[in-house]
Amino acid sequence: MGKTISFSAIILVFLLVSTGLMKQGDAQAQKCEWECKLLPNFPCWLKGAGEGLCDNLCKYEGAISGVCVSDPHRCLCRNRKPGCS
């Protein structure tokens, strides 16, 4: 009985985690959001200058905007096209 409950709990946790990852993966698969190729692992520690650099280089890559995110530190390029939220 205990093994069945543990197995069910593991399956439930797996489904919850995979659902959250799938939403993020869908955005990346549709090319709605990707990490800036010119600034991999960019910490955006320069505040306005870092955010401006992120935005400019993402636009150079064809995105509509670039956004600095802090967890984990990186520069994300975002596209606005049908299917992207």
Swiss-Prot record:
The keyword Signal applies. This is Defensin-like protein 11. Residues 1-29 form the signal peptide. Its main location: secreted. Keywords: Antimicrobial, Disulfide bond, Fungicide, Plant defense, Secreted, Signal. One of its GO terms (biological process) is defense response to fungus. GO terms for cellular component: extracellular region. It is found in: Secreted. The keyword Secreted applies. Belongs to the DEFL family. Disulfide bonds join 32-84, 44-68, 54-75, 58-77.
